[in-house]
């Protein structure tokens, strides 16, 4: 089954916890703190594998979770960083954040990688908190939570040439005779339910990748029929091969077919009309084809080459394939509009979120929430009094106490943070 669009949940690994420990060795009085830091959690990485051409990996597994970093150990030994979770994807994969619509990655080259969510930093051990005033701190940090996202993964096949046309004009037959691909062929509409790829080798030892897409019908760009689901795959083809049933076997006018398909491409993306086109006048072995071709050329206003072929009898295919190969030699391979090399770091300004927000529940409890305050809470080890006191100081420094008083909080009021409750004390 061909899968080219799927929603996925990804969660990077949390950082390992720091450790509270002390040196206890003979002849080492006042050994001091010796708790190590936790290891970093694993990143979730998408990596291009050119052997794949579908998102089948995601069909039955739509939740990916990275491993947690190792906890810190005694004798100031740091925990081990977790290995990244590497997920193979086909070339042409685009990753989009479902909540913001931001394009996270556009993967087009073999072995290209992108970090989709970043693993959490390991928590610091008590060695890191030693100061002259507190040489033996009884506190450590929990690991930072790993990032998590709901993402949409889309595949836009990277083929040199894309076959377009109405259903049953002979696209699949053409692909089957010029390549080793074996698409399903039958005498009814929408026999092709998903894209098929084939490698074409010309007689002069040139080659290119040809994509057969489900047939388009009028209104495809608005979601009518099946072809609209796969219009995105045309975006990365370098040449559009427009296959037309020149015999008009279903009673349609070939020139009207040509205009309607181009209109659908234009409605989907106007830039597609700038893509080089070659017209394959198919079924020339059938009655009325020659007369229709003469009429077609008389009405054709565009300066587009027309090649007479019969996919069934294989007539005219040599000249058509040579023309496609010649055209491809003049067109650069697909590149992203905004090319970012591995050496380039793009900094985007992002407005800093407020560290916390306060709302009030119907029962009168005050609710604290916000990315920063929730992160501090999760990284606090509440089993040690010094860590609790540090968390209280952090809240005071952020202005949480003052903000609660301004909201009307009084002694004994309940304050909620995540699934925990606290008592407000003036």
Swiss-Prot record:
Mg(2+) binds at residues 172, 192. SUPFAM superfamilies: Obg GTP-binding protein C-terminal domain (SSF102741), Obg GTP-binding protein N-terminal domain (SSF82051), P-loop containing nucleoside triphosphate hydrolases (SSF52540). GO terms for biological process: ribosome biogenesis. Its cofactor is Mg(2+). GO terms for molecular function: GTP binding; GTPase activity; magnesium ion binding. Signal peptide: none annotated. Residues 1-158 form the Obg domain. InterPro entries: G_OBG, GTP-bd, GTP-bd_Obg/CgtA, GTP-bd_prot_GTP1/OBG_C_sf, GTP1-OBG_CS, GTP1_OBG_dom, GTP1_OBG_dom_sf, OBG_GTPase. Its EC number is 3.6.5.-. Residues 66-86, 119-146 are annotated as: Disordered. GTP binds at residues 165-172, 190-194, 212-215, 282-285, 310-312. One of its GO terms (cellular component) is cytoplasm. Residues 348-426 form the OCT domain. Keywords: Cytoplasm, GTP-binding, Hydrolase, Magnesium, Metal-binding, Nucleotide-binding. Transmembrane segments: none annotated. It is an enzyme of class 3 (hydrolase). It is found in: Cytoplasm. Residues 159-329 form the OBG-type G domain. Its main location: cytoplasm. An essential GTPase which binds GTP, GDP and possibly (p)ppGpp with moderate affinity, with high nucleotide exchange rates and a fairly low GTP hydrolysis rate. Plays a role in control of the cell cycle, stress response, ribosome biogenesis and in those bacteria that undergo differentiation, in morphogenesis control. Monomer. Belongs to the TRAFAC class OBG-HflX-like GTPase superfamily. OBG GTPase family. This is GTPase Obg.
């Amino acid at each position: 089954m061909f899968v080219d669009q799927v929603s996925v949940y990804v969660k990077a690994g949390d950082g390992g916890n720091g450790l509270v420990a002390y040196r206890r060795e003979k002849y080492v009085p006042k050994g001091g703190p010796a708790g190590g830091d936790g290891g970093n959690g694993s990143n979730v990485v998408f990596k291009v594998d050119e052997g794949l051409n579908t998102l089948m990996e995601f069909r039955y597994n739509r939740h990916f979770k990275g491993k947690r970093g190792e906890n810190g150990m005694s004798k100031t030994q740091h925990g081990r960083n977790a290995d990244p979770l590497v997920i193979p994807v086909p070339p042409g994969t685009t990753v989009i954040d479902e909540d913001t619509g931001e394009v996270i990655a556009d993967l087009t080259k073999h072995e290209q990688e992108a970090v989709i969510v970043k693993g959490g930093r390991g928590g610091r051990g008590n060695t890191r908190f030693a100061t002259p005033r507190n040489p033996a701190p009884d506190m450590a940090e929990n690991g930072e939570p790993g990032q998590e996202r709901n993402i949409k993964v889309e595949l836009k096949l990277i083929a040199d040439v894309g076959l377009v046309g109405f259903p049953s004009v002979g696209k699949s037959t053409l692909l089957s005779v010029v390549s080793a691909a074996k698409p399903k062929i039958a005498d009814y509409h929408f026999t092709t339910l998903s894209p098929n790829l084939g490698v074409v080798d010309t007689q002069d030892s040139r080659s290119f990748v040809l994509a057969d897409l489900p047939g388009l019908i009028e209104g495809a760009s608005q979601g009518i029929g099946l072809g609209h689901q796969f219009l995105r795959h045309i975006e990365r083809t370098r040449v559009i091969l427009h296959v037309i049933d020149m015999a008009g076997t279903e009673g349609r006018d070939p020139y009207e077919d040509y205009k309607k398909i181009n209109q659908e491409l234009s409605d989907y993306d106007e830039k597609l009309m700038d893509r080089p086109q070659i017209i394959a006048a198919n079924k020339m072995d059938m009655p009325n084809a020659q007369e229709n071709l003469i009429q077609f050329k008389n009405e054709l206003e565009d300066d587009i080459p027309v090649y007479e072929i019969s996919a069934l009898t294989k007539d005219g295919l040599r000249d058509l394939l040579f023309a496609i190969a010649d055209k491809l030699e003049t067109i650069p391979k697909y590149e992203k509009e905004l090319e970012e090399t591995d050496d380039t770091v793009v900094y985007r300004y992002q407005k800093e979120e407020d560290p916390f927000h306060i709302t009030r529940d119907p029962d009168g409890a005050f609710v604290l929430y916000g990315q920063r305050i929730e992160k501090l809470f999760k990284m606090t080890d509440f089993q040690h009094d010094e860590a609790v006191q540090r968390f209280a100081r952090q809240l005071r420094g952020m202005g949480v106490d003052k903000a609660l008083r301004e909201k009307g909080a009084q002694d004994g009021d309940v304050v909620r943070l995540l699934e925990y409750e606290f008592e407000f004390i003036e």
